[in-house]
């Protein structure tokens, strides 16, 4: 039956940045589909751990600043040592800094680029090596953005990094498909998370945004559950190098 293709029973998913918001929603979706979760965060994701384990799934919490890539191989080695294998990687951890392009600092450029694109590549590289060694392939899902497609304003390093995420997703898909590794991305639209709290509090700006979204509402972390389970499951085995917009129709407007 087709529904069995969406089952993730027995799988292990590594999810970065899953303490709140979209990362938490995706981790919970994967756990509901059957995954045990390895969460990599800069803080202990207490709420996520509680919700995942309440589903009867295991959760391994690892603490790291992924802007520093030296420790990435050891993180995935630790995950494999704990569970025996890893099957899915979700590169969700991200950072945004806002300033006019004329005033944007090197530090704000480097901090965002190091986390949003550099860590994505080296996390994927380390995971792919495990997938190849295990011999069963794997799934890598990167988190892109509407600014992978659009320019935006006052977020130069974020736009550059998310454009890079979509590009490197395609490259890795091209190189690793022969190893049965699927690499795809999700581009969330305007989501009701901590990152958009200021925007949502601005009544005029929030109204302008909602007027542009055909669905007429802000997205929720739960809106990513279906797409992440699809891309992590065998139902997407012939989907490779693609970025799925989950934006209520924003990009279609």
From Swiss-Prot:
Its EC number is 1.1.1.127, 1.1.1.-. It catalyses: 2-dehydro-3-deoxy-D-gluconate + NAD(+) = 3-deoxy-D-glycero-2,5-hexodiulosonate + NADH + H(+); 4-pregnen-20,21-diol-3-one + NAD(+) = 21-hydroxyprogesterone + NADH + H(+). NAD(+) binds at residues 14-38. It comes from the Bacteria. GO terms for biological process: D-galacturonate catabolic process; D-glucuronate catabolic process. One of its GO terms (molecular function) is 2-dehydro-3-deoxy-D-gluconate 5-dehydrogenase activity. Induction: Is under the control of KdgR repressor. Its expression is up-regulated in the presence of galacturonate and glucuronate. Is also up-regulated in intestinal E.coli of mice fed a lactose-rich diet and down-regulated in E.coli of mice on a casein-rich diet. Belongs to the short-chain dehydrogenases/reductases (SDR) family. This is 2-dehydro-3-deoxy-D-gluconate 5-dehydrogenase.
